[in-house]
């Protein structure tokens, strides 16, 4: 019968929830019992029930509702009761004084009389003692009969009540509690002694007792009884006359029934459906702890199961079950639709079955607590769904199931891929659960309803039945075999009967051990024994293939479904993983308490097949068996997941643990380690860290990648990379480090990515991770053990490298010894360093340079260490023998530190370290030796020290020379003045050295001589300014003082002097020192007052340039332009513009100045001015304006014509004159002479057309009168004859920039549109193949022309400098700079 889900209402807070209903086991009604109320009592410690029927029959039912036996006493049945063992049922019958004692085992019936004095006394109630085989009977005469069934002794207790005994009970202490309708209550011993008695105010009913813990933890028996249906009386069993009467709210109604529970608490049910919980403890007696309305119609009865920890109630045609620890929650609700008037509910001692009866005589038996019985195979599970029904879920994640109806109640189950095995006692039944008929039935059912809603129920027939020698305790199956544990034996046999029917039992007789545990996989039977063995029995070989002896017995094993590893728990309470391949044992990381581990389950999903979980009663601990880990096969702890109460894990698939609950049903728990987060953007950093850690532990790289991309946290990327490396996934590690930009790690990993050898690859990874000891071990186990030595060498771990070299490559020992010796030398271990240096020396018969260098290093080390260890003679001798200077210096330093100055000086001198040698000799007071070395000494300090020594010895000239060499000018001047009396030399030294102290000495010397001008100068140099000024003022030598301040003074001194001159009205000098002091406005204002003085104007320009003050300079420009009515020399304005970096303005001014000189006919002056401006701009890295450059070219072209004519370069001169005539406006005072010369020279150069042109120009009325008589007739003839003549074609030469041909005298290229520099010697544009520059002014020209003029001893036409240093140069570099300059 399936479970129904019924909506239930909790009346206290009107919360609606869902709970399951109890399963109906069977129901018997009026047909069996007759019509009317019945009495039913569960047999103690069992699941059978006795029913006193309305038809006066006592029926004894088994667990399935079958009648075991029946008894038909004569008369109406009024009460029945079981003895404490459940062997004898006492039956009370009305209208007769006989009590029937029915032995249900032997089926015999005895009788006992209920009358105390006569047979007319009729029984009214009876009860058995819970501790002895004693029956107590109450009768209608108020008497009590005590009957011991074992001894057949009968005791009549009379006079306890005056009227009929209505209820009787016996406590565990054998006190008889009885009540009567005479309103009395009595406690009596079995011998009839009255313990306590009392009279109540109403009729006592529902009498009971309970135990309440008193002081010290001892239990006190309390008697409870309902008085008049309203009051619950509580009293101590020996003090009934001191009761506590409890009354309750009127709304509850009358007390219907109540039950004691949990040591001193009472549940009371009222007829109006209310149930309350109160306490009987002294400090809270009567306190209502919980109250709720259970039924709205009526409440019929309540029962309490302490083993089940439940409250069971009936009413309103329902059965409700609540947890005693949480009474506000209904855990089970069952509707009884067939009956309307329920009367009584009773539960078995184990809480598994509940009997509910009605007024009409119907008895319903419900299953409220199924036996928690289940088994699993990979991800298939079978579990008990009814006492004789087993549900098989073939694949848990597919939600499909089928239920097999059995003929027995199984106590043990086993599940395989195709079969189910169930056992009861020593018999095992095997079933198929994947038969075609079952599958067809399941498909038909699923076409109409979901398999999840109702499983397929099949009446199964066993395919095999096997009996064993003792009770079966465990069954395990695979495809073909069954392994059954009975007693201390294990039998392995086929599931189905076959012809060979092979079977074998373990442990074998010769093993002399008992079975501890076992497990069955597809390929192996694995079992453990008391003598510590784990044994693998191969099913294919049918033989034992592996035996491993552990240190202690293994109490349980849980094998991997497909691999040869298993999880084991041993008697030391340790958990481990055992691998049968190599007998390796990996202990599980310490998590939780291994003493409480209950079992282990392996992941059945292929991707996570190396994951397994160990569980206790509270948690599931997830581990990973890592086979690719760099440390080898190992167990990694992943995480823990809380296990709900009373959940027993059965299988693990895709991170979901399927568990058996305490109610016999299945439930699932998702492991925290397998929880995946589809959205991580809203997660906290802590949660993201946790998810990343789980993903890395489970090797879920894709999830880890998404997390790291989201967080973009360097620590997350590094954690990811380390996990990948430790798992030998170099490719993933490269991807990670490339993502975070770690080029060094990417490069390092790419070098090892292609390594296929496992040990070598892992060693390289360990090296990268700085785990060098592990790396060395793996290198040595790899095919390239020398890598271990190389690694130690790279790490400078010389002792370890030497150990490796001794066995692997002894030839490396000298080299390693040398390195180790150097390290020991640095750490101060000189003795061991010496020993290693000596080991490092190698024979070199062939004088190989490499070995020679190596030996020199070792021998140098030997020399040093010999000295440091006290063997001075050996060390010094060896140092002198070695060729190098360094060893001599090093050994000498050591000797010097040891105060062995003589030996140190010798080595310094031999090593040509003269300064050090002299210094050591000074320490040794070897003055003569210092004198010998002094010519080689460069240290000023040594010279000064030696000079002081010579001075003491009055060798002043030698001392002066030493002071000069040591640059101790103060002492040198002192000796030169006195005692050597050489003031001229002293003055020279002071002027060159700028020595302040020396200047003071010289000043004092000149004061003594009366040379105040010199004294003032040297006083200023020595910063004795005030003294110098007073001396100057006193001796009318302020001008000399001013000169000294100008050269050596600071700002404050210059300012004081300026104010002095201002006071004496010397404006120029005041302005000069204001300028030096930075007081530019004061200086300018004074200079403007003397604007006619050229010196003042020049100083004003200097002041403006220094100030960099825009306002002041604008004011100065206006002043220079004649704002005061007096225009100043434009050259000063030009100088100002140049100094201020105003290139354009400076160029314009220069052109203007040049034009002024041109207008006066001073062409060379104009040219020189423009050239000077050109050079200044170039020196200041300033742009040279095109106009200025063009003016300079035009004037310079005219000036060099005379020189060309003198050199007979007529054509060149003519071409330049043509250029000059093109710029004739630049030569206003010499127009006629220039035109005349042009006519003459062009005629000579056969440039007839140009000559005619210029001659015609002279014939104009403006110029004709000014023509010289000598040339007038000739010019007239040229004009008359000319007109059709032509000039010689101008030569084309390549452009130095683009190499395109252009006219030789053109200054711009039509092709590249570039300005081309001109030759300062010929006026033609330069060419790249014949380029040079003047060595002095660096102006360009033809190298051939420079060379020609140099041979003629002529100078540069531009600057007048010597041309002998001109050399061919690269025109391209010059042109690139010119392009920048002439923009």
UniProtKB/Swiss-Prot annotation:
Which controlled-vocabulary keywords does the entry list?
Cell projection, Cilium, Cilium biogenesis/degradation, Protein transport, Repeat, TPR repeat, Transport, WD repeat
Cysteine pairs forming cystine bridges in this chain are none
Output the InterPro entries linked to this UniProt entry. TPR-like_helical_dom_sf, TPR_IF140/IFT172/WDR19, TPR_IFT80_172_dom, WD40/YVTN_repeat-like_dom_sf, WD40_repeat_dom_sf, WD40_rpt, WDR19/dyf-2, WDR19_WD40_rpt
Could you confirm whether the keyword Repeat appears in this record? yes
Q: Where are the TPR repeats?
A: 756-789, 810-847, 885-918, 940-973, 996-1029, 1031-1053, 1064-1097
Tissue expression summary: Expressed in ciliated sensory neurons.
Query: Localized where?
Result: Cell projection, Cilium
Q: Which GO terms describe its cellular component?
A: cilium; intraciliary transport particle A; intraciliary transport particle B; non-motile cilium
**Pfam family example for this protein?**
Beta-prop_WDR19_2nd
The entry's protein name is: WD repeat-containing protein dyf-2
Q: Which GO terms describe its biological process?
A: chemosensory behavior; chemotaxis; cilium assembly; intraciliary retrograde transport; intraciliary transport; non-motile cilium assembly; olfactory behavior; protein localization
Q: Which gene encodes it?
A: dyf-2
Query: SMART domains annotated for this entry?
Result: WD40
Organism the protein comes from = Caenorhabditis elegans
Superkingdom of source: Eukaryota
Extent of the WD repeats? 32-71, 72-112, 118-157, 160-198, 337-376
Query: What do mutants without this gene show?
Result: Defects in cilium morphology and mislocalization of intraflagellar transport proteins. Specifically, phasmid cilia are shorter compared to wild-type, ciliary IFT A complex proteins such as che-11, osm-5 are mislocalized, and the transport and accumulation of the ciliary IFT B complex protein che-13 is impaired. Mutants also display a strong osmosensory (osm) phenotype with an aversion to high osmolarity, and they exhibit impaired chemotaxis in response to volatile odorants such as pyrazine and iso-amyl alcohol.
Q: How does it assemble?
A: Component of the IFT complex A (IFT-A) composed of at least che-11, daf-10, dyf-2, ift-139, ift-43 and ifta-1.
Its annotated function is as follows: Component of the IFT complex A (IFT-A), a complex required for retrograde ciliary transport. Moves along the ciliary axoneme and is involved in the assembly, localization and the movement of other intraflagellar transport (IFT) proteins along the cilia axoneme. May also associate with the BBSome complex in order to mediate ciliary transport. Regulates cilia biogenesis, morphology and sensitivity to environmental cues.
């Amino acid at each position: 019968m399936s479970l129904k889900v019924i909506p239930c209402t909790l009346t206290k807070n009107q919360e609606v929830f869902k709970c399951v209903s109890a399963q109906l086991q069977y129901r018997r009604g009026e047909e069996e019992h007759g019509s009317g109320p019945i009495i039913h009592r569960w047999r103690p410690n069992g699941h059978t029930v006795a029913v006193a029927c309305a038809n006066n029959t006592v029926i004894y039912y088994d667990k399935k509702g079958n009648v075991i036996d029946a008894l038909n006493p004569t008369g109406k049945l009024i009460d029945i009761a079981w003895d404490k063992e459940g062997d004898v049922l006492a039956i009370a019958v009305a209208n007769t004084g006989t009590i029937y004692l029915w032995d249900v085992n032997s089926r015999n019936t005895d009788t006992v009389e209920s009358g105390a004095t006569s047979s007319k006394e009729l029984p009214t109630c009876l009860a058995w003692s819970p501790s002895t085989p004693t029956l107590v009977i109450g009768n209608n005469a108020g008497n009590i009969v005590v009957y011991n069934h074992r001894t057949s002794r009968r005791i009549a207790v009379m006079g306890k009540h005056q009227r009929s005994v209505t209820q009787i009970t016996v406590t565990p202490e054998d006190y008889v509690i009885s009540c009567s309708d005479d309103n009395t209550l009595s406690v009596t011993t079995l011998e009839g002694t009255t313990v306590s008695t009392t009279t109540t105010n109403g009729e006592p009913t529902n009498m009971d007792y309970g135990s309440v813990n008193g002081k010290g933890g001892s239990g006190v028996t309390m008697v409870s009884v309902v008085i008049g249906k309203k009051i619950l009386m509580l009293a101590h069993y020996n003090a009934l006359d001191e009761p506590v009467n409890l009354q309750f709210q009127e709304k509850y109604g009358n007390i219907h029934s109540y039950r004691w529970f949990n040591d001193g608490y009472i549940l009371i049910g009222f007829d109006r459906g209310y149930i309350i919980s109160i306490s009987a403890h002294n400090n809270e007696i009567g306190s209502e702890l919980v109250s709720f309305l259970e039924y709205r119609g009526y409440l019929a009865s309540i029962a309490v199961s302490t083993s089940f920890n439940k409250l069971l109630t009936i009413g309103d045609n329902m059965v409700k079950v609540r947890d005693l620890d949480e009474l506000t929650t209904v855990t089970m609700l069952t509707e009884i639709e067939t009956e309307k008037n329920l009367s009584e509910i009773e539960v078995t001692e184990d809480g598994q079955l509940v009997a509910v009866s009605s007024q009409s005589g119907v008895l319903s038996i419900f299953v409220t607590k199924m036996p928690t019985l289940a088994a699993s195979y990979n991800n298939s599970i079978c579990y008990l769904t009814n006492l004789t029904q087993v549900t098989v879920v073939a694949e848990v994640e597919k939600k499909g199931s089928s239920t097999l109806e059995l003929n027995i109640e199984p106590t043990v189950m086993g599940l395989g891929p195709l079969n189910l095995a169930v056992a009861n006692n020593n018999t095992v039944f095997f079933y198929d659960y994947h038969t075609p008929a079952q599958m067809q039935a399941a498909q038909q059912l699923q076409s109409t309803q979901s398999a999840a809603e109702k499983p397929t129920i099949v009446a199964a027939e066993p395919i095999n039945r096997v009996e064993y020698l003792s009770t079966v305790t465990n069954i395990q199956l695979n495809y073909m075999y069954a392994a059954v544990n009975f007693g201390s034996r294990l039998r392995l046999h086929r599931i189905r009967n076959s012809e060979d029917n092979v079977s074998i039992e373990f442990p074998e007789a010769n093993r002399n051990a008992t079975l501890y545990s076992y497990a069955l996989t597809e390929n192996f039977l694995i079992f453990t024994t008391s003598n510590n063995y784990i044994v693998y029995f191969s099913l294919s070989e049918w033989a034992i293939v592996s035996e491993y002896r552990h240190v202690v017995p293994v109490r349980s094993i849980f094998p991997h479904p497909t691999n040869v590893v298993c999880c084991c728990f041993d008697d030391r309470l340790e958990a481990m993983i055992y691998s049968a391949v190599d007998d390796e044992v990996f202990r599980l990381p310490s998590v939780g308490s291994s003493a409480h581990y209950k079992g282990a389950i392996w992941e059945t999903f292929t991707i996570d097949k190396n994951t397994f979980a160990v569980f206790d009663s509270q948690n599931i601990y997830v581990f990973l068996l890592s086979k690719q880990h760099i440390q080898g096969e190992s167990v990694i702890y992943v995480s823990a997941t809380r296990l709900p109460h009373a959940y027993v894990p059965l299988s693990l698939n895709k991170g979901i643990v399927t568990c058996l609950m305490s109610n016999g049903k299945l439930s699932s728990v998702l492991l925290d380690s397998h929880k995946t987060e589809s959205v991580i953007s809203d997660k906290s950093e802590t949660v993201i860290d946790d998810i990343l850690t789980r993903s890395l532990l489970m090797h879920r790289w894709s999830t880890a990648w998404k997390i790291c991309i989201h967080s973009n946290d360097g620590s997350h990327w590094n954690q990811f990379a380390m996990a990948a490396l430790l798992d030998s996934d170099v490719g993933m590690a490269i991807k990670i480090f490339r993502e975070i930009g770690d080029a060094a790690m990417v490069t390092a990993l790419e070098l090892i990515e292609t390594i296929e050898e496992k040990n070598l690859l892992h060693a390289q990874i360990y090296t990268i991770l700085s785990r060098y000891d592990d790396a060395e071990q793996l290198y040595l186990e790899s095919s390239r053990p020398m890598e271990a030595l190389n690694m130690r060498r790279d790490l400078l771990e010389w002792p370890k490298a030497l150990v490796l070299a001794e066995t692997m490559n002894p030839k490396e020992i000298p080299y390693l010894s040398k390195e180790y010796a150097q390290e020991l030398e640095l750490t101060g271990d000189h003795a061991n360093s010496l020993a290693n240096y000596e080991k490092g020396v190698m024979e070199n018969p062939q004088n190989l340079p490499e070995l020679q260098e190596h030996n020199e290093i070792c021998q140098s080390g030997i020399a040093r260490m010999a000295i440091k260890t006290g063997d001075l003679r050996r060390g010094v001798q060896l140092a002198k023998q070695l060729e190098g200077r360094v060893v001599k210096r090093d050994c000498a330093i050591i000797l010097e530190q040891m105060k062995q100055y003589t030996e140190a000086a010798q080595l310094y001198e031999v090593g040509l370290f003269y300064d050090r040698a002299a210094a050591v000799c000074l320490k040794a007071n070897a003055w003569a030796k210092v004198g010998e070395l002094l010519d080689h000494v460069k240290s000023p300090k040594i010279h000064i020290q030696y000079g002081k020594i010579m001075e003491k010895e009055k060798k002043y000239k030698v001392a002066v020379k030493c002071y000069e060499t040591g640059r101790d000018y103060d002492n040198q001047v002192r000796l030169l003045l006195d005692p050597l009396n050489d003031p001229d030399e002293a003055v020279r030294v002071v002027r060159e050295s700028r020595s302040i102290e020396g200047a003071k000495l010289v000043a004092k010397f000149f004061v003594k001589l009366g040379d105040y001008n010199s004294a003032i100068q040297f006083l200023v140099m020595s910063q004795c300014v005030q003294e110098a000024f007073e001396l100057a003022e006193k001796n009318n030598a302020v001008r000399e003082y001013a000169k000294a301040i100008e050269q050596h003074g600071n700002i404050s001194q210059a300012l004081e002097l300026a104010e002095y001159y201002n006071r004496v009205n010397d404006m120029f000098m005041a302005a000069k020192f204001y300028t030096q002091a930075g007081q530019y406005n004061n200086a300018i204002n004074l200079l403007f007052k003397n604007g006619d003085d050229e010196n003042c104007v020049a100083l004003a320009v200097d002041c403006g340039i220094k100030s960099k003050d825009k306002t002041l300079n604008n004011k100065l420009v206006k002043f220079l332009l004649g704002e005061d009515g007096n225009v100043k020399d434009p050259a000063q304005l030009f100088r100002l513009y140049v100094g201020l970096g105003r290139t354009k303005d400076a160029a314009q001014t220069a052109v203007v100045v040049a034009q002024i000189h041109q207008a006066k006919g001073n062409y060379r002056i104009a040219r020189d001015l423009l050239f000077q401006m050109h050079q200044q701009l170039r020196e200041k890295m300033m742009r040279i304006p095109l106009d200025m450059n063009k003016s300079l070219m035009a004037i310079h072209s005219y000036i060099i014509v005379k020189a060309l004519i003198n050199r007979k370069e007529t054509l060149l001169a003519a071409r330049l004159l043509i250029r000059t005539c093109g710029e004739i406006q630049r030569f206003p005072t010499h127009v006629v002479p220039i035109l005349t010369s042009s006519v003459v020279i062009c005629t000579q150069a056969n440039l007839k057309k140009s000559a005619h042109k210029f001659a015609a120009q002279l014939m104009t009325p403006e110029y004709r009168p000014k023509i010289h008589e000598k040339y007038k007739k000739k010019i007239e003839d040229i004009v008359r004859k000319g007109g059709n003549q032509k000039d010689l074609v101008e030569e084309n030469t390549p452009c130095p920039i683009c190499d395109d041909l252009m006219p030789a005298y053109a200054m711009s290229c039509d092709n590249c549109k570039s300005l081309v520099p001109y030759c300062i010697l010929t006026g033609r544009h330069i060419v790249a193949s014949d380029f040079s520059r003047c060595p002095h002014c660096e102006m360009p020209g033809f190298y051939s022309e420079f060379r020609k003029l140099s041979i003629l001893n002529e100078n540069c036409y531009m600057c007048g400098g010597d041309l002998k240093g001109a050399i061919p140069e690269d025109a391209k570099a010059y042109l690139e700079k010119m392009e920048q300059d002439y923009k």
